[in-house]
From Swiss-Prot:
Location(s), subcellular: Secreted
Protein name per Swiss-Prot or TrEMBL: Secreted frizzled-related protein 5
Domain NTR: 178-300
Gene from which the chain derives: Sfrp5
InterPro entries: Frizzled/SFRP, Frizzled_dom, Frizzled_dom_sf, Netrin_domain, Netrin_module_non-TIMP, SFRP5_CRD, TIMP-like_OB-fold
Gene Ontology process terms (BP): cell differentiation; convergent extension involved in axis elongation; digestive tract morphogenesis; negative regulation of Wnt signaling pathway; post-anal tail morphogenesis; regulation of establishment of planar polarity; Wnt signaling pathway
Organism: Mus musculus (Mouse)
UniProt record similarity statement: Belongs to the secreted frizzled-related protein (sFRP) family.
Length: 314
Protein backbone atom coordinates (compact mmCIF):
# COMPACT_ATOMS: atom_id res chain seq x y z
CA UNK A 1 0.00 0.00 0.00
CA UNK A 2 2.87 2.37 0.88
CA UNK A 3 4.47 1.81 -2.55
CA UNK A 4 1.19 2.53 -4.31
CA UNK A 5 0.69 5.70 -2.27
CA UNK A 6 4.28 6.80 -2.96
CA UNK A 7 3.69 6.36 -6.68
CA UNK A 8 0.54 8.43 -6.45
CA UNK A 9 2.30 11.16 -4.50
CA UNK A 10 5.13 11.20 -7.03
CA UNK A 11 2.69 11.52 -9.92
CA UNK A 12 0.94 14.44 -8.27
CA UNK A 13 4.26 16.07 -7.43
CA UNK A 14 5.35 15.85 -11.08
CA UNK A 15 2.13 17.48 -12.19
CA UNK A 16 2.43 20.27 -9.64
CA UNK A 17 6.09 20.76 -10.48
CA UNK A 18 5.21 21.27 -14.12
CA UNK A 19 2.66 23.87 -13.12
CA UNK A 20 5.31 26.06 -11.48
CA UNK A 21 6.56 27.21 -14.85
CA UNK A 22 3.13 27.80 -16.32
CA UNK A 23 1.86 31.06 -17.85
CA UNK A 24 -0.21 33.44 -15.78
CA UNK A 25 -3.79 32.58 -15.00
CA UNK A 26 -5.26 35.22 -17.26
CA UNK A 27 -3.15 34.19 -20.28
CA UNK A 28 -3.80 30.48 -19.86
CA UNK A 29 -7.53 30.51 -19.27
CA UNK A 30 -8.13 33.10 -21.97
CA UNK A 31 -6.39 30.66 -24.30
CA UNK A 32 -8.59 27.75 -23.24
CA UNK A 33 -11.74 29.86 -23.34
CA UNK A 34 -12.56 29.44 -19.65
CA UNK A 35 -12.73 32.00 -16.87
CA UNK A 36 -12.92 31.27 -13.17
CA UNK A 37 -16.23 32.36 -11.74
CA UNK A 38 -15.90 35.54 -9.67
CA UNK A 39 -15.89 34.97 -5.93
CA UNK A 40 -19.24 36.71 -5.50
CA UNK A 41 -17.62 40.11 -5.38
CA UNK A 42 -16.03 39.28 -2.05
CA UNK A 43 -13.01 41.33 -1.01
CA UNK A 44 -10.36 39.85 1.24
CA UNK A 45 -8.74 41.56 4.18
CA UNK A 46 -5.43 39.74 3.66
CA UNK A 47 -3.32 39.08 0.55
CA UNK A 48 -2.86 35.46 -0.57
CA UNK A 49 -0.49 33.52 1.65
CA UNK A 50 1.09 30.08 1.78
CA UNK A 51 1.28 27.89 4.85
CA UNK A 52 1.94 24.30 5.81
CA UNK A 53 -1.00 21.90 5.67
CA UNK A 54 -1.41 21.08 9.38
CA UNK A 55 -1.78 17.59 10.80
CA UNK A 56 -5.20 18.54 12.20
CA UNK A 57 -6.51 19.03 8.66
CA UNK A 58 -6.80 15.28 8.04
CA UNK A 59 -8.75 15.64 4.80
CA UNK A 60 -5.65 17.02 3.07
CA UNK A 61 -2.64 16.36 5.29
CA UNK A 62 -1.66 13.30 3.21
CA UNK A 63 -2.72 14.60 -0.19
CA UNK A 64 0.82 14.61 -1.65
CA UNK A 65 2.05 18.20 -1.20
CA UNK A 66 2.90 20.07 1.98
CA UNK A 67 1.90 23.70 1.52
CA UNK A 68 -1.45 25.27 0.72
CA UNK A 69 -2.72 28.64 -0.39
CA UNK A 70 -5.17 30.93 1.42
CA UNK A 71 -7.74 32.16 0.61
CA UNK A 72 -8.62 28.81 -0.91
CA UNK A 73 -10.86 28.21 -3.93
CA UNK A 74 -13.95 28.02 -1.71
CA UNK A 75 -13.42 31.54 -0.34
CA UNK A 76 -12.21 30.41 3.09
CA UNK A 77 -9.83 33.05 4.43
CA UNK A 78 -8.64 31.41 7.64
CA UNK A 79 -7.22 28.02 8.48
CA UNK A 80 -9.83 27.66 11.21
CA UNK A 81 -12.60 28.05 8.62
CA UNK A 82 -10.94 25.51 6.33
CA UNK A 83 -10.65 22.96 9.14
CA UNK A 84 -14.27 23.45 10.16
CA UNK A 85 -15.68 23.02 6.67
CA UNK A 86 -13.29 20.27 5.53
CA UNK A 87 -13.99 18.05 8.54
CA UNK A 88 -17.51 17.36 7.33
CA UNK A 89 -16.13 15.65 4.21
CA UNK A 90 -14.06 13.06 6.09
CA UNK A 91 -16.86 10.45 6.14
CA UNK A 92 -17.12 10.66 2.35
CA UNK A 93 -13.36 10.21 2.00
CA UNK A 94 -13.52 7.18 4.29
CA UNK A 95 -16.11 5.56 2.02
CA UNK A 96 -13.55 5.46 -0.86
CA UNK A 97 -16.24 6.15 -3.42
CA UNK A 98 -13.57 7.26 -5.93
CA UNK A 99 -9.78 7.09 -5.92
CA UNK A 100 -9.49 10.81 -6.68
CA UNK A 101 -11.89 12.13 -4.05
CA UNK A 102 -9.09 13.47 -1.86
CA UNK A 103 -7.24 15.11 -4.75
CA UNK A 104 -10.42 16.82 -5.95
CA UNK A 105 -11.56 18.07 -2.54
CA UNK A 106 -8.10 19.24 -1.51
CA UNK A 107 -7.58 21.13 -4.77
CA UNK A 108 -10.41 23.33 -3.46
CA UNK A 109 -10.01 23.24 0.33
CA UNK A 110 -6.19 23.32 0.39
CA UNK A 111 -4.96 24.34 -3.09
CA UNK A 112 -1.27 23.83 -3.72
CA UNK A 113 0.90 26.83 -2.94
CA UNK A 114 1.79 28.42 -6.29
CA UNK A 115 1.81 32.02 -7.49
CA UNK A 116 -1.66 31.55 -8.97
CA UNK A 117 -4.55 29.22 -8.12
CA UNK A 118 -4.69 25.89 -9.93
CA UNK A 119 -8.22 24.61 -10.46
CA UNK A 120 -9.34 20.99 -10.78
CA UNK A 121 -10.16 19.98 -14.34
CA UNK A 122 -13.80 19.40 -15.16
CA UNK A 123 -13.06 15.72 -15.83
CA UNK A 124 -11.70 15.32 -12.28
CA UNK A 125 -14.88 16.83 -10.87
CA UNK A 126 -17.04 14.62 -13.08
CA UNK A 127 -15.14 11.47 -12.09
CA UNK A 128 -15.45 12.24 -8.37
CA UNK A 129 -19.12 13.13 -8.79
CA UNK A 130 -19.86 9.91 -10.71
CA UNK A 131 -18.31 7.84 -7.93
CA UNK A 132 -19.59 9.73 -4.90
CA UNK A 133 -22.86 11.45 -5.81
CA UNK A 134 -24.93 8.22 -5.65
CA UNK A 135 -23.54 7.53 -2.18
CA UNK A 136 -24.35 11.07 -1.02
CA UNK A 137 -27.83 10.75 -2.50
CA UNK A 138 -28.37 7.59 -0.47
CA UNK A 139 -27.99 9.72 2.67
CA UNK A 140 -30.22 12.50 1.35
CA UNK A 141 -27.55 14.94 0.15
CA UNK A 142 -27.41 16.21 -3.43
CA UNK A 143 -24.08 17.01 -5.05
CA UNK A 144 -23.54 20.55 -3.68
CA UNK A 145 -23.79 23.67 -5.80
CA UNK A 146 -20.26 24.76 -4.88
CA UNK A 147 -18.95 21.58 -6.55
CA UNK A 148 -20.96 21.75 -9.78
CA UNK A 149 -18.55 20.62 -12.47
CA UNK A 150 -19.36 23.37 -14.99
CA UNK A 151 -17.49 25.73 -12.67
CA UNK A 152 -14.18 24.10 -13.60
CA UNK A 153 -12.12 24.25 -16.82
CA UNK A 154 -12.09 21.65 -19.55
CA UNK A 155 -8.99 19.45 -19.46
CA UNK A 156 -5.75 21.24 -20.27
CA UNK A 157 -2.16 21.16 -19.10
CA UNK A 158 -2.77 23.68 -16.33
CA UNK A 159 -5.55 22.18 -14.28
CA UNK A 160 -5.48 19.11 -12.04
CA UNK A 161 -6.74 16.11 -14.00
CA UNK A 162 -7.80 12.63 -12.92
CA UNK A 163 -4.81 11.13 -11.13
CA UNK A 164 -5.62 7.68 -9.82
CA UNK A 165 -8.99 6.80 -11.28
CA UNK A 166 -7.55 3.90 -13.27
CA UNK A 167 -5.96 2.30 -10.20
CA UNK A 168 -7.77 -0.20 -7.99
CA UNK A 169 -9.00 1.14 -4.67
CA UNK A 170 -6.73 0.42 -1.71
CA UNK A 171 -7.91 -1.23 1.49
CA UNK A 172 -10.48 -1.06 2.88
CA UNK A 173 -12.04 -2.31 -0.35
CA UNK A 174 -15.15 -0.78 -1.79
CA UNK A 175 -18.05 -2.92 -0.64
CA UNK A 176 -21.03 -3.92 -2.75
CA UNK A 177 -23.30 -3.94 0.27
CA UNK A 178 -25.84 -1.12 0.32
CA UNK A 179 -24.33 1.91 2.03
CA UNK A 180 -27.16 1.96 4.56
CA UNK A 181 -26.39 -1.64 5.52
CA UNK A 182 -22.73 -1.21 6.44
CA UNK A 183 -22.64 -1.84 10.16
CA UNK A 184 -20.76 -0.26 13.03
CA UNK A 185 -19.78 -2.73 15.72
CA UNK A 186 -18.75 -0.37 18.53
CA UNK A 187 -20.99 1.75 20.73
CA UNK A 188 -19.09 4.87 19.64
CA UNK A 189 -19.65 4.05 15.98
CA UNK A 190 -23.35 3.49 16.58
CA UNK A 191 -23.66 6.75 18.50
CA UNK A 192 -21.91 8.65 15.70
CA UNK A 193 -24.56 7.31 13.34
CA UNK A 194 -27.27 8.30 15.79
CA UNK A 195 -25.81 11.79 16.08
CA UNK A 196 -25.94 12.27 12.34
CA UNK A 197 -29.46 10.89 11.93
CA UNK A 198 -32.63 12.89 12.46
CA UNK A 199 -34.47 9.99 14.07
CA UNK A 200 -33.84 6.55 15.60
CA UNK A 201 -36.61 3.96 15.85
CA UNK A 202 -36.95 0.40 17.10
CA UNK A 203 -39.53 -1.21 14.83
CA UNK A 204 -40.77 -4.26 12.99
CA UNK A 205 -40.83 -4.32 9.19
CA UNK A 206 -44.01 -5.60 7.58
CA UNK A 207 -42.75 -5.75 4.00
CA UNK A 208 -40.25 -4.34 1.52
CA UNK A 209 -41.17 -2.96 -1.89
CA UNK A 210 -39.05 -1.86 -4.84
CA UNK A 211 -39.80 1.60 -6.23
CA UNK A 212 -37.76 3.40 -8.94
CA UNK A 213 -34.44 1.92 -7.88
CA UNK A 214 -35.12 2.35 -4.16
CA UNK A 215 -36.28 -0.05 -1.48
CA UNK A 216 -39.27 0.98 0.59
CA UNK A 217 -39.41 -0.44 4.09
CA UNK A 218 -43.02 -0.55 5.28
CA UNK A 219 -43.23 -0.57 9.06
CA UNK A 220 -45.65 -2.75 10.97
CA UNK A 221 -48.49 -0.80 12.57
CA UNK A 222 -47.58 -1.85 16.09
CA UNK A 223 -44.40 -2.48 18.04
CA UNK A 224 -42.70 0.84 17.21
CA UNK A 225 -40.60 2.67 19.77
CA UNK A 226 -39.24 6.15 19.06
CA UNK A 227 -35.79 6.36 20.59
CA UNK A 228 -35.06 9.73 18.97
CA UNK A 229 -38.08 11.43 17.43
CA UNK A 230 -36.37 14.44 15.85
CA UNK A 231 -38.65 15.93 13.16
CA UNK A 232 -41.02 12.95 12.99
CA UNK A 233 -44.67 13.91 13.30
CA UNK A 234 -47.61 11.75 14.27
CA UNK A 235 -48.54 11.14 10.62
CA UNK A 236 -44.98 9.94 9.93
CA UNK A 237 -45.07 7.35 12.68
CA UNK A 238 -48.64 6.20 12.10
CA UNK A 239 -47.58 4.59 8.85
CA UNK A 240 -43.81 4.48 8.88
CA UNK A 241 -42.35 4.18 5.37
CA UNK A 242 -38.57 4.42 4.99
CA UNK A 243 -36.93 4.95 1.61
CA UNK A 244 -33.60 3.25 1.02
CA UNK A 245 -32.16 5.34 -1.81
CA UNK A 246 -30.48 3.39 -4.63
CA UNK A 247 -31.01 0.23 -2.59
CA UNK A 248 -33.06 -1.89 -4.99
CA UNK A 249 -30.22 -4.02 -6.35
CA UNK A 250 -27.49 -4.03 -3.68
CA UNK A 251 -27.44 -6.68 -0.93
CA UNK A 252 -28.46 -5.92 2.64
CA UNK A 253 -27.96 -9.01 4.82
CA UNK A 254 -29.90 -7.52 7.74
CA UNK A 255 -33.06 -7.45 5.62
CA UNK A 256 -32.87 -11.00 4.25
CA UNK A 257 -35.20 -12.08 7.04
CA UNK A 258 -37.86 -9.68 8.33
CA UNK A 259 -38.68 -11.57 11.52
CA UNK A 260 -37.95 -9.78 14.77
CA UNK A 261 -37.29 -6.11 15.42
CA UNK A 262 -34.87 -3.66 13.81
CA UNK A 263 -32.98 -0.57 14.94
CA UNK A 264 -33.32 1.96 12.13
CA UNK A 265 -31.95 5.47 11.69
CA UNK A 266 -32.83 8.05 9.10
CA UNK A 267 -33.25 11.63 7.94
CA UNK A 268 -36.30 13.58 6.89
CA UNK A 269 -35.65 15.27 3.55
CA UNK A 270 -38.39 17.21 1.75
CA UNK A 271 -41.06 15.27 3.59
CA UNK A 272 -39.56 11.87 2.75
CA UNK A 273 -38.03 9.59 5.36
CA UNK A 274 -34.66 8.32 4.16
CA UNK A 275 -33.06 5.28 5.77
CA UNK A 276 -29.43 5.91 6.74
CA UNK A 277 -28.70 2.77 8.81
CA UNK A 278 -30.41 -0.48 9.75
CA UNK A 279 -29.51 -3.16 12.31
CA UNK A 280 -31.23 -6.28 13.54
CA UNK A 281 -32.28 -5.62 17.13
CA UNK A 282 -30.18 -7.76 19.42
CA UNK A 283 -30.93 -7.39 23.12
CA UNK A 284 -27.80 -9.39 23.93
CA UNK A 285 -25.56 -6.95 22.05
CA UNK A 286 -23.89 -4.89 24.79
CA UNK A 287 -22.55 -2.27 22.36
CA UNK A 288 -26.03 -1.66 20.93
CA UNK A 289 -27.63 -1.48 24.38
CA UNK A 290 -24.98 1.00 25.55
CA UNK A 291 -25.41 3.18 22.44
CA UNK A 292 -29.20 3.32 22.80
CA UNK A 293 -28.98 4.13 26.50
CA UNK A 294 -26.39 6.89 26.22
CA UNK A 295 -26.98 8.36 22.74
CA UNK A 296 -28.21 11.69 24.11
CA UNK A 297 -25.14 12.15 26.31
CA UNK A 298 -22.69 11.38 23.50
CA UNK A 299 -20.64 14.47 22.46
CA UNK A 300 -21.81 14.79 18.87
CA UNK A 301 -19.48 16.74 16.60
CA UNK A 302 -20.82 20.08 15.37
CA UNK A 303 -19.25 19.89 11.94
CA UNK A 304 -18.98 16.17 11.26
CA UNK A 305 -22.27 15.86 9.49
CA UNK A 306 -22.32 17.50 6.05
CA UNK A 307 -22.27 14.02 4.54
CA UNK A 308 -23.99 11.92 7.18
CA UNK A 309 -25.89 14.99 8.03
CA UNK A 310 -26.58 17.54 10.67
CA UNK A 311 -30.30 17.68 10.48
CA UNK A 312 -31.53 20.41 8.21
CA UNK A 313 -34.21 22.77 9.48
CA UNK A 314 -37.66 21.21 9.14
Amino acid sequence: MWVAWSARTAALALLLGALHGAPTRGQEYDYYGWQAEPLHGRSYSKPPQCLDIPADLPLCHTVGYKRMRLPNLLEHESLAEVKQQASSWLPLLAKRCHSDTQVFLCSLFAPVCLDRPIYPCRSLCEAARAGCAPLMEAYGFPWPEMLHCHKFPLDNDLCIAVQFGHLPATAPPVTKICAQCEMEHSADGLMEQMCSSDFVVKMRIKEIKIDNGDRKLIGAQKKKKLLKAGPLKRKDTKKLVLHMKNGASCPCPQLDNLTGSFLVMGRKVEGQLLLTAVYRWDKKNKEMKFAVKFMFSYPCSLYYPFFYGAAEPH
